[in-house]
Protein backbone atom coordinates (compact mmCIF):
# COMPACT_ATOMS: atom_id res chain seq x y z
CA UNK A 1 0.00 0.00 0.00
CA UNK A 2 1.17 3.48 -0.79
CA UNK A 3 1.05 6.36 1.69
CA UNK A 4 -1.97 7.73 -0.22
CA UNK A 5 -3.71 4.34 0.06
CA UNK A 6 -3.13 4.29 3.80
CA UNK A 7 -4.59 7.78 4.24
CA UNK A 8 -7.56 6.93 2.01
CA UNK A 9 -8.22 3.87 4.17
CA UNK A 10 -8.01 5.96 7.34
CA UNK A 11 -10.39 8.55 5.83
CA UNK A 12 -12.95 5.92 4.83
CA UNK A 13 -12.89 4.23 8.24
CA UNK A 14 -13.06 7.62 9.99
CA UNK A 15 -16.08 8.91 8.07
CA UNK A 16 -17.93 5.58 8.27
CA UNK A 17 -17.31 5.36 12.03
CA UNK A 18 -18.30 8.96 12.75
CA UNK A 19 -21.50 8.55 10.73
CA UNK A 20 -22.40 5.42 12.68
CA UNK A 21 -21.71 7.06 16.05
CA UNK A 22 -23.65 10.24 15.21
CA UNK A 23 -26.53 8.10 13.92
CA UNK A 24 -26.66 6.14 17.18
CA UNK A 25 -26.53 9.34 19.26
CA UNK A 26 -29.31 10.85 17.13
CA UNK A 27 -31.46 7.74 17.63
CA UNK A 28 -30.85 7.77 21.40
CA UNK A 29 -31.77 11.45 21.63
CA UNK A 30 -34.98 10.85 19.64
CA UNK A 31 -35.74 7.81 21.83
CA UNK A 32 -35.77 5.81 18.61
CA UNK A 33 -32.90 3.35 19.06
CA UNK A 34 -33.68 0.13 17.19
CA UNK A 35 -31.53 -2.97 16.89
CA UNK A 36 -33.05 -3.63 13.45
CA UNK A 37 -32.03 -0.18 12.20
CA UNK A 38 -28.58 -0.61 13.75
CA UNK A 39 -28.13 -3.93 11.92
CA UNK A 40 -29.23 -2.29 8.66
CA UNK A 41 -26.82 0.58 9.28
CA UNK A 42 -23.97 -1.84 9.96
CA UNK A 43 -24.88 -3.69 6.78
CA UNK A 44 -24.62 -0.45 4.80
CA UNK A 45 -21.25 0.35 6.39
CA UNK A 46 -20.03 -3.16 5.60
CA UNK A 47 -21.09 -2.68 1.96
CA UNK A 48 -19.12 0.58 1.77
CA UNK A 49 -16.03 -1.13 3.19
CA UNK A 50 -16.35 -3.99 0.69
CA UNK A 51 -16.70 -1.47 -2.15
CA UNK A 52 -13.55 0.30 -0.94
CA UNK A 53 -11.70 -3.04 -0.71
CA UNK A 54 -12.73 -4.00 -4.26
CA UNK A 55 -11.62 -0.58 -5.56
CA UNK A 56 -8.24 -1.00 -3.84
CA UNK A 57 -7.84 -4.44 -5.39
CA UNK A 58 -8.65 -3.07 -8.86
CA UNK A 59 -5.88 -0.51 -8.41
CA UNK A 60 -3.47 -3.22 -7.27
CA UNK A 61 -4.27 -5.31 -10.34
CA UNK A 62 -3.85 -2.19 -12.50
CA UNK A 63 -0.32 -1.76 -11.10
CA UNK A 64 0.65 -5.16 -12.56
CA UNK A 65 -1.69 -5.48 -15.54
CA UNK A 66 -2.47 -2.36 -17.54
CA UNK A 67 -6.25 -2.10 -17.37
CA UNK A 68 -6.11 1.29 -19.05
CA UNK A 69 -7.56 3.13 -16.08
CA UNK A 70 -6.69 6.84 -16.25
CA UNK A 71 -6.93 7.38 -12.48
CA UNK A 72 -7.12 5.57 -9.18
CA UNK A 73 -10.42 3.73 -8.75
CA UNK A 74 -9.60 3.46 -5.04
CA UNK A 75 -9.15 7.19 -4.48
CA UNK A 76 -12.32 8.01 -6.44
CA UNK A 77 -14.33 5.39 -4.53
CA UNK A 78 -13.05 6.54 -1.15
CA UNK A 79 -13.80 10.14 -2.09
CA UNK A 80 -17.36 9.23 -3.01
CA UNK A 81 -17.91 7.19 0.16
CA UNK A 82 -16.49 10.01 2.32
CA UNK A 83 -18.78 12.59 0.69
CA UNK A 84 -21.84 10.37 1.18
CA UNK A 85 -20.87 9.82 4.81
CA UNK A 86 -20.18 13.54 5.34
CA UNK A 87 -23.69 14.36 4.14
CA UNK A 88 -25.14 11.87 6.61
CA UNK A 89 -22.92 13.15 9.44
CA UNK A 90 -24.11 16.71 8.81
CA UNK A 91 -27.74 15.57 8.85
CA UNK A 92 -27.18 13.69 12.11
CA UNK A 93 -25.29 16.53 13.79
CA UNK A 94 -27.93 19.13 12.90
CA UNK A 95 -30.63 16.87 14.34
CA UNK A 96 -28.58 16.26 17.49
CA UNK A 97 -28.00 20.01 17.84
CA UNK A 98 -30.58 21.97 15.78
CA UNK A 99 -28.77 25.22 16.62
CA UNK A 100 -25.99 24.18 14.26
CA UNK A 101 -28.33 24.17 11.28
CA UNK A 102 -28.11 27.95 10.87
CA UNK A 103 -24.55 28.38 12.15
CA UNK A 104 -22.52 30.55 9.75
CA UNK A 105 -19.79 27.93 9.23
CA UNK A 106 -22.39 25.39 8.07
CA UNK A 107 -22.95 27.45 4.91
CA UNK A 108 -19.85 25.90 3.36
CA UNK A 109 -21.79 22.62 3.19
CA UNK A 110 -24.89 24.08 1.52
CA UNK A 111 -25.35 23.09 -2.10
CA UNK A 112 -25.70 26.02 -4.45
CA UNK A 113 -27.70 25.91 -7.66
CA UNK A 114 -26.58 29.34 -8.77
CA UNK A 115 -23.21 30.88 -9.49
CA UNK A 116 -20.67 30.10 -12.14
CA UNK A 117 -21.65 26.42 -12.38
CA UNK A 118 -25.41 26.87 -11.95
CA UNK A 119 -28.03 27.08 -14.65
CA UNK A 120 -28.19 30.50 -16.17
Walk through the language-model features, giving the residues of each:
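Membrane-helix boundary elements
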Residues: 1-15
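Alpha-helical transmembrane segments of integral membrane proteins
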Residues: 5-9, 46-47, 71-81, 91
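Membrane-interface helix-loop junction between the first two transmembrane segments
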Residues: 11-14, 20-37
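Alpha-helical transmembrane segments of multi-pass membrane proteins
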Residues: 12-22, 48-56, 77-88
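Membrane-helix exit/interface motif
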Residues: 25-29, 53-66
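Membrane interface segments of multi-pass transport proteins and intramembrane proteases
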Residues: 32-36, 63-70, 95-103
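Juxtamembrane helix-capping/reentrant segments at transmembrane boundaries
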Residues: 33-48
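Membrane-proximal cytosolic segments adjacent to transmembrane helices
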Residues: 82-120
Amino acid sequence: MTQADIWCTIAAIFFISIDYVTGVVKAIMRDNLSSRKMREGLGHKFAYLMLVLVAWFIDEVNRHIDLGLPMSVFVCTVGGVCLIELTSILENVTEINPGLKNAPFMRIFVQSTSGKHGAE
